[in-house]
């Protein structure tokens, strides 16, 4: 058996199946689109699910992939095992080959045998093969067993197991079938190898590959007409086998990352081995963090974002347990990017975003970690004092809500101290909030989509790319939740046409408005949406006459409004290109709104955009507009578009054919470059034909809308012109108010500000003079208490600093005295006590003087022996407190 690096294993697997007629399909994003049952891709077959279910056709019938996977929730939840286990991970790579009704068991097993024994050169005598033993519903998979033996497997090492281990189902319906797993014995002593070790907890037996044979329909358990194959080989486990180690953390996939943790902390081997679980967990979590952020997930409180937050905060806490006091994850993640960046270029491309987003989240958590740990320790002590072993669920919820502690982190810390957490109570504390969220979501989905589904209408034919007015037939209508055959004047309706030029809200672009004119009436269309895939629904009101199902209508889009929308949509694409040119390729779209009056673009960037950068972005956009370059679109293959550098929206699911919108860069203008390359984006929206149609672009705001997400709002065309006119009018009005011309406005404002500063200084000087005169009058009110000069008085002061200045002025004037001043500042009593140095040496103390006085006004205070101050809640008691200074000083001086 040859030793191979993980990269060599990946390449060997892919190239082997490519040579055997398989199409190499790149890994899909970790973010699974259009599948509410999955947050993340957790196996290689996820991106082919619709192919296996017969919902989607691909131009190939056999494929090979190296798929990014994440398992952190649901049935496939490895999070708690990560660290203590030598082989469990959150993020991992799954190598797989697939047949979509092409080859089946015979070729799949032959290919597997050839790869394992000839390419990887695994020792046959250490390999075990399992097949389905059969049950009352499904016969045993004798075919697979015979095929393994025919390839050369020892019959005694072909074992049979039941459904738990060797039968695969996708769900209650869909394809299912037996699977055949390949296990390798990695123990040092071959004589100890036993059949009982397969599918056991014995660490000497490692499952390296699973071949799933989809041959039955789950609903009927009848054979499928075109059986398929789905296989999965975990790269991490295969690397462990090929590199002769007993833990995936000892492979080249992890060694460099763990070494970086050791280096960053300044650890030694002894410390690593004493805290190995924590080091491993950090290394694993760093990989998950890097890939999640690269695939567009940022830390947050919902869904995928919360999973990332949980993983990152677990890693930060693990760092705390091994001695990290400051943020360290960015250093560790850098090692991940360096190691995995060649195989997954998105890591390099989004390096800045990955590092800054992770560092920002870690710092945010560390600010609350100490307080949370203190709170949790207090809860633990209370639980133990009651003689209990369970942390109440409500306390766990408070830790999450106030300190950002995910439940699993609280459970981990509790387990370290021999306690558990009341999960039911935790869920109960969140139940009301969850119920509200579910109700809101259900209300949003509503029953309209179900009504349209019941009508079973054909998909609408969209003609809005080519024309803005078209003949169409009304094929369906709803009103107030009921199916209608006709509607009269004043009725609000939702209408479906067989053909329509109206664009339905999608991809951030809002829906068209316009008019439907039929033989007996007309409908004002106020919005257009798509409640079901392929179904375009027009929302409007019958403005005259009657509209009926079956009517032939002229459907006309509001052309002025559509033109405004198109200007903003094309400008949105240009804005993304300009942001990437100025800020870096990490500035990727995180959301957008394309409306007739404005555009809004959300993008990934972890700090405010510098005003100079924002100005450069706007300048680039307007140069591009003046260049009047061509905007075109085409239907092309997804892989071809991506190979040409097209930008796809994170988390969006695309078919094999896509619509590619290109905004040409054209020639650099004499006034300078405006784009580094053409803008290429996958987009179904509507656009102008040339950038010059946009007129010009004005960015009106930029700000943060969440962790690592910025938002720009901009105007184009008529909207930008209106904004400029509004600003000009504002300048004219300002100029008129200060009796100048707009061109001299800045100069005039500077002069007014200078005059204001001068008047303010003069006023301040006058106030100081008056204050000193007031204080000088107080000098005559000095009284002697036990031989100590005392000045106690209530004064007027607008701040504590002013009160302090007064006290210091009197101290300097008196030279040898105790001074007690009081003032009402912002409605609250404030006290100041000063003891000159010679009296401090005699034993007097300003702090001891102010505390009893502060108690009289319902407060407290502190300071130094020479000067102290205090505040309180009862301004009506201030005079009494000042009067009590004589008695308090007498007590001290006596």
Swiss-Prot record:
The record, for SUPFAM superfamilies, names: Class II aaRS and biotin synthetases, Putative anticodon-binding domain of alanyl-tRNA synthetase (AlaRS), ThrRS/AlaRS common domain, Translation proteins
Q: Which organism is it from?
A: Chloroflexus aurantiacus (strain ATCC 29366 / DSM 635 / J-10-fl)
The principal localisation class reads cytoplasm
Residues annotated as binding Zn(2+): 569, 573, 683, 687
Designated name of the protein: Alanine--tRNA ligase
Whether Metal-binding counts among this entry's keywords is yes
NCBIfam families reported in the protein's UniProt record: alaS
Q: Name one GO molecular function term.
A: alanine-tRNA ligase activity
GO BP term, example: alanyl-tRNA aminoacylation
């Amino acid at each position: 058996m040859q030793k191979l690096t993980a990269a060599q294993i990946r390449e060997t697997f892919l190239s082997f199946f490519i040579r055997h007629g398989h199409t190499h399909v790149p890994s899909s994003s970790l973010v699974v689109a259009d599948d509410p049952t999955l947050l993340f891709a957790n196996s290689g077959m996820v991106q082919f699910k619709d192919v296996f279910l017969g919902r989607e056709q691909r131009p190939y019938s056999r494929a090979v992939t190296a798929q990014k996977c994440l398992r952190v929730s649901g049935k496939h939840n490895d999070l708690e095992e990560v660290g203590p286990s030598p082989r469990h991970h959150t993020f991992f790579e799954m190598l797989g080959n697939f047949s979509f009704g092409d080859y089946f068991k015979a070729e799949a097993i032959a290919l597997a045998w050839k790869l394992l024994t000839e390419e990887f050169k695994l020792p046959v005598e250490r390999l075990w093969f399992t097949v389905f033993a059969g049950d009352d519903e499904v016969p045993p998979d004798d075919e697979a067993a015979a095929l393994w033996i025919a390839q050369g497997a020892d019959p005694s090492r072909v074992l049979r197991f039941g459904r738990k281990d060797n039968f695969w189902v996708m769900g209650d319906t869909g394809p299912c079938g037996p699977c055949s797993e390949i296990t390798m014995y990695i123990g040092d002593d071959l004589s100890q190898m036993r059949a009982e070790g397969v599918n056991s907890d014995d660490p000497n037996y490692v499952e390296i590959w699973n071949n799933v044979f989809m041959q039955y329909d789950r609903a009927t358990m009848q054979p499928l007409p075109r059986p398929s194959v789905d296989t999965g080989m975990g790269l991490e486990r295969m690397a462990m086998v090929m590199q002769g180690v007993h833990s995936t953390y000892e492979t080249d996939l992890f060694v460099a990352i763990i070494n970086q943790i050791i280096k960053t902390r300044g650890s030694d081997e002894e410390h690593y081995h004493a805290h190995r679980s924590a080091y491993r967990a950090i290394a694993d979590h760093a990989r998950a963090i890097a890939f999640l952020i690269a695939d567009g997930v940022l830390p947050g409180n919902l869904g995928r974002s919360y999973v990332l937050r949980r993983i990152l905060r677990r890693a930060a806490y693990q760092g705390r347990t091994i001695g990290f006091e400051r943020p360290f994850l960015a250093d560790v993640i850098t090692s991940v990017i360096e190691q995995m960046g060649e195989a997954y270029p998105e890591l390099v491309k989004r390096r800045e975003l990955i590092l800054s987003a992770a560092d920002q989240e870690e710092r945010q958590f560390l600010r609350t970690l100490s307080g949370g740990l203190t709170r949790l320790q207090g809860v633990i002590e209370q639980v133990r004092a009651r003689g209990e072993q369970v942390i109440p669920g409500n306390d766990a919820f408070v830790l999450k809500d106030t300190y950002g502690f995910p439940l699993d982190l609280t459970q981990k810390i509790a387990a370290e101290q021999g306690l558990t957490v009341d999960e039911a109570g935790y869920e109960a504390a969140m139940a009301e909030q969850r119920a509200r969220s579910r109700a809101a979501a259900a209300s949003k989905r509503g029953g309209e989509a179900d009504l349209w589904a019941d009508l079973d209408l054909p998909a609408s034919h969209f003609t809005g790319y080519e024309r803005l007015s078209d003949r169409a037939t009304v094929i369906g209508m709803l009103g107030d939740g009921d199916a209608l055959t006709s509607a009269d004047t004043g009725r609000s309706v939702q209408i479906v046409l067989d053909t329509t030029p109206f664009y339905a809200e999608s991809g951030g672009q809002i829906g068209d408005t316009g008019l439907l004119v039929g033989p007996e009436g007309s409908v004002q269309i106020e919005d257009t949406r798509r409640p079901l895939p392929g179904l375009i629904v027009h929302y409007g009101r019958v403005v005259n006459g009657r509209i009926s199902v079956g009517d032939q209508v002229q459907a006309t889009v509001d052309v002025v409004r559509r033109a405004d929308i198109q200007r903003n949509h094309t400008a949105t694409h240009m804005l993304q290109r300009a942001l990437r040119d100025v800020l870096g390729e990490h500035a990727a779209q995180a959301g957008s709104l394309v409306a007739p009056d404005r555009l809004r673009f959300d993008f990934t960037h972890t700090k405010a955009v510098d005003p100079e950068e924002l100005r450069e972005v706007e300048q680039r956009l307007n140069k591009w507009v003046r260049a009047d370059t061509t905007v075109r679109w085409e239907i092309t293959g997804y892989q071809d578009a991506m190979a040409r550098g097209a930008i796809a929206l994170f988390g969006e699911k695309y078919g094999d054919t896509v619509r590619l919108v290109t905004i040409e860069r054209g020639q650099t203008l004499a006034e300078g470059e405006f784009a580094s390359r053409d803008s290429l984006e996958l987009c179904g929206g509507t656009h102008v034909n040339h950038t010059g149609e946009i007129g010009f672009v004005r960015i009106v705001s930029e700000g943060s809308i969440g962790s690592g997400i910025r938002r720009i709002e901009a105007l184009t065309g008529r909207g930008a012109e209106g904004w400029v006119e509004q600003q000009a009018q504002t300048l004219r009005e300002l100029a008129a108010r200060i009796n100048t011309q707009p061109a001299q406005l800045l100069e005039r404002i500077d002069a007014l500000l200078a005059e204001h500063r001068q008047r303010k200084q003069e006023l301040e000087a006058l106030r100081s003079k008056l204050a000193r005169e007031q204080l000088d009058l107080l000098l005559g009110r000095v009284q002697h208490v036990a031989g100590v000069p005392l000045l106690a008085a209530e004064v007027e002061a607008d701040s504590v600093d002013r009160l302090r200045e007064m006290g210091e002025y009197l101290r300097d004037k008196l030279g040898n005295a105790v001074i007690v001043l009081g003032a009402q500042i912002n409605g609250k009593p404030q006290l100041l006590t000063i003891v000159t140095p010679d009296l401090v040496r005699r034993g007097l103390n300003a702090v001891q003087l102010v505390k009893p006085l502060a108690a009289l006004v319902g407060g407290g205070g502190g300071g130094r022996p020479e000067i102290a101050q205090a505040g309180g809640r009862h301004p009506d008691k201030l005079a009494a407190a000042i009067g009590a200074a004589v008695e308090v000083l007498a007590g001290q001086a006596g």
